[in-house]
Design a protein with these regions (language model features):
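A structural signal for short beta-strand/turn segments enriched in small hydrophobics and glycine
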Residues: 43, 105-111, 160, 165, ...
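Conserved PDZ fold ligand-binding element
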Residues: 44-46, 168, 242-265
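PDZ/PDZ-like domain micro-motif
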Residues: 154-159, 216-224, 237-255, 270
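Residue-level recognition of beta-strand microenvironments
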Residues: 42, 73-75, 129, 150, ...
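Conserved active-site neighborhood of the chymotrypsin/trypsin-like protease fold
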Residues: 3-5, 21, 26-120, 144-145, ...
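Active-site region of chymotrypsin-like
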Residues: 21-23, 82, 86-95, 120-178, ...
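C-terminal cap/linker of serine protease catalytic domains
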Residues: 1-17, 114, 163, 167-228, ...
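Short, small/polar residue-rich loop motifs at catalytic or cofactor-binding pockets
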Residues: 31-34, 152-156, 230, 239-240, ...
Length: 303
């Protein structure tokens, strides 16, 4: 690649960062380093849920050092998104949004605001794009977008932008065990709409922790079952839905709503369209004997 091409690309990326950066704010809602946010719609900022540890006192710092107060409109830990409402009207630039999905290998920029409120950027490529993905807490992402770039502390809640400065989504380290990923536009917009309507998103909650285990051949033969694995209950939340249904520590969960379950992802998929208050049939093995329980779903607490 010639030096003139590289220089042109460099200027284009600098212009993209400058343009998109007008919509990026620092979000002061935790004790140390601020997180980042994006002025998403008129009067609204989107940021990361996990960075809001002091949600009762939120200060935003925009381009040029402009300080703004904001209140929490809603948050969803399952997608690590939060929506903030500005206390007063502000003359902030709205971003341009991309009308095409990111593709593997595309050059992208992650933007944020530093401790000193300067615009900062990290460059890289889209490292992977796959279909719909369930987060570890049960949220649904329309795409799983992995990044091959460094997402430095304070970048969560900031935008991923293309080489033209158009927003592709919101970056976070709060999902995927600390690995950087991007929440796609469709996911962000759907979540924002729900949070503005209800303040939170109700997710079903079992109130237990489980891990996959293999079933001994002798037990499978005794039960005349072809199921080779189940979920061992390693924790039951006191007074939670599973506790009230009679689930005990050490039970082996084999079926939920008549469907075999071999990992927790199976359960998240089975309950994806359920609402708190609904009931599900849960089949367990206790002391080698099958047992059927009726469990009333609770609501996933915001943490």
């Amino acid at each position: 690649m010639s030096s003139s091409v590289l220089e042109t690309l460099s200027h284009e990326l600098a212009a993209a960062a400058e343009t998109a950066g007008e919509s990026v704010v620092a979000v002061h809602a935790r004790r140390w380093l601020p997180s980042s946010g994006v002025y998403w719609r008129t009067g609204l900022v989107v940021t990361s849920h996990h960075a809001l540890t002091h949600a009762a006192d939120i200060t935003l710092v925009a381009e040029g050092g402009k300080q703004l107060k904001a209140t929490l409109a809603g948050r969803d830990p399952t997608t690590d998104l939060a929506v903030l409402k500005l206390a007063v009207e502000a003359d902030l630039a709205l971003p341009a949004f991309s009308d095409t999905a990111p593709k593997l290998g595309h050059i992208v920029l992650a933007l944020g605001r530093s401790r000193n409120h300067n615009l900062v950027a990290s460059a890289g490529i889209v490292g992977g794009v796959s279909g719909e993905w369930r987060t570890p807490r049960g949220g649904r992402l329309d795409q799983h977008i992995r990044l091959s770039l460094d997402l430095y502390p304070g970048f969560s809640g900031g935008p991923l932008v293309d080489a033209q400065g158009r927003v592709l989504g919101i970056n976070t380290r709060g999902l995927g065990r600390g690995r950087p990923l991007t929440l796609p536009l469709a996911t962000v917009n759907r979540t924002v709409d729900e949070l503005l309507e209800k303040g939170h998103i109700a997710r079903p909650y079992l109130g237990l922790a489980m891990q996959p285990v293999s079933l001994p051949e002798s037990l499978r033969h005794h039960l005349a079952s072809s199921v080779s694995s189940a979920l061992l209950v390693i924790h039951v939340e006191p007074s939670g839905p599973a506790d009230k249904a009679g689930v005990l520590l050490g039970d082996l969960v084999t079926e939920v709503r008549g469907k075999s379950v071999e990992d927790t992802e199976n359960i998240r998929d089975l309950l994806a369209s359920d609402q708190p208050g609904g009931t599900v049939a849960v089949s367990v093995l206790r002391g080698g004997s099958p047992l059927k329980l009726s469990l009333t779903l609770g609501e996933l607490p915001i943490r």
